[in-house]
Swiss-Prot record:
The gene is mnmE. CDD domains: trmE, TrmE_N. This is tRNA modification GTPase MnmE. Its EC number is 3.6.-.-. The keyword tRNA processing applies. Homodimer. Heterotetramer of two MnmE and two MnmG subunits.
Amino acid sequence: MIGDDIAAISTAPGEGGIAIVRLSGNDVIEKVERIFKPYRAGIKLSDKEGYSLSLGWLCDEKMEIIDEVLLGLMRAPRSYTGEDVVEINCHGGTLPARRCLEAVMWQGVRLAQPGEFTRRAFLNGRLDVSQAEAVIEVIRAKTERGMNLALKQLAGRNSQEINLLEDQMIEVNAMLEASLDFPDEVGDLDYSAAQGKLQEVKNRIDKLLLAGERAEIYREGINVAICGKPNVGKSSLLNALLRKEKAIVTSIPGTTRDIIEDYINIRGIPVKLKDTAGIRSTEDLVERIGIERSQEVISEADLVLFILDVGTGIDQEDRKIYEKIEKKNKIVLVNKEDLEEKNISEAELEQLFPGVKIVRGSIIEETGLEELEESIEKAVLSGQLQSDDMEVMINLRQKNALLTAKRHIEESLAAMGKVSLDCLGVDIWGALEALGEISGKNLKEEVIERIFHDFCIGK
């Protein structure tokens, strides 16, 4: 029930400098005051202004000291939830935070549900639903680029875009209703003007969807598989990109027998990099199992880095491997360019890999790596919106709502002048309702429950 008093530990479990127990509700200030002994005698928490701090001791129900704490007080409506909020900053560690939480629960404060603080912020009008969803995007961001996009959503960028679309759809609906209700005064619907506005909204939705696809890459990241025959430098490339010794590197072919993977940030894109076993014909059972796993990883990868050895040239093994990845999104890396003898020519590369990005370099001397990272970024973002004027992060729920709105608009455009105004109005309202699901104006309770279900306790 909104307004009742809730509490939860808001910091991650484990040892640390401090831990924070957050409380929100109508009576949390009074309840914390009962078990708080300020250092300065005569200071009452209930008399303090918002955005103030108080140092003292937090006690249990018997007024025995639990911990030295710093209380942060935020008064409604200028708090995260829009209600009175108290944050108890205690010593870090599981036990101090748990004891502080138990102490306030003895005063009649209940344990918060996952996402309940943010849900209250939404219900109290502090955040709209798009901003509330951005909170979890900020928490889960894997790179600075992804976090910056989430912060823009939290600041209301998505809401501004949706509000603009809603305003335009309301204008079209007003034109429609005026022609229906006041035909003598207003006259027939100006189909040309209505079509123009609907087309404008549709174009804007298309841009939002494209921008959302690009943001999805920054949020979820991509899987990149490194492949090639044994001893071409796959593990060396993994180590070079990670800037650490993750994979064992030897001159013995077949050293890597299982998938080695790690995360890396390439120009703001979270990349799960997977070093695969060298693909070749072998009688070794363990190596053969590793090769089979490699082929599975390659088939599931968003991008494949295919490595060639300039010293050995392109042989039949290389050609067989390339046949398996020919239809994949790929980059060819010609390695060991530091060798004096080079057995791969530009003409041969152009003939075998037409239209494929070729990067030449030496992993051991770290040449070509910057070009490779740039090529990975371009390959991943190929065809995506590049303009910075439409930077939004769109989740699956919002994407589905936009697609629904777009479908209604397309049906309206197709039916314009062919059906009655009443029938036309059905799709206009359908588009408005779909947009309202993004802004939160038309959200059902079960959808709200689903949105906040994925939040952690204490947020």
